Amino acid sequence: PGADAGLGVLAKLKIESSYSFGYLKFEGLSFVDAKDPARNKMFIEDFFINSSFFNDQLVIRAGYQIFNWSDLEVFHPADVVNSIDYDSDLESLDKKGELTLSMEYPILSGELTLFLWPKVEKSIYPSENSRLGLGTEIADPNWVIDNQVISKQWNNQFGILVNQSIFKGDYKFHYIKHIDRK
């Protein structure tokens, strides 16, 4: 008790490839801690196929994706789509990929993107022995939808994103109906 010691190995695997039917991307993360097996984890960050149709006018992407709603990769109030690994680097928490179906179509001087998220990934919380933990095991998350507490991961959620370049500025407008992972 009171000692904070750890010995861990973090590995990331990234594979990207183009095919006649589209673009495939896989990115996964694995962490093994020799002193605290409760911290061992493996999860998908990105694993999707990206295909274009109608002379590249319609882009459909399906699979697990990480979203960064901020172009600068800094804190952003709307950056709530992905579940988080709270037992990772505090300055840049790892995100878990979310199962996604998206369709992107060009409009005016930008794009309109529709998102469907059928499943909520569970965030990873620090173990009771972690330096970031509370000294007790944190239970699996529950979510509140329409004033009802639920624990099922399969819940339909959606989002709309409009990107536009107007004059010399880039603008993003979005609407998200989802379960907040934070």
Could you say what each language-model-derived stretch is?
Residues D4-L10, R39-M42, S92-K96, S151-N155:
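Transmembrane beta-barrel outer-membrane domains
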Residues A3-A5, E16, P37, D87-E91, ...:
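Outer-membrane beta-barrel proteins
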Residues A11-S17:
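Histidine-anchored nucleotide/phosphate-binding helix
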Residues K12, E98-T100, Q157-G159:
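Short hydrophobic/aromatic beta-strand or adjacent loop that forms the aromatic wall/cage
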Residues G133-K182:
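Surface-exposed beta-loop-beta
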Residues S17-L132, F167:
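Outer membrane beta-barrel
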Residues L10, E104, F115, N163, ...:
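Residues in well-ordered beta-strands of folded domains
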Residues G2-A5, K119-K122, Q157, L161, ...:
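Outer-membrane beta-barrel biogenesis signature
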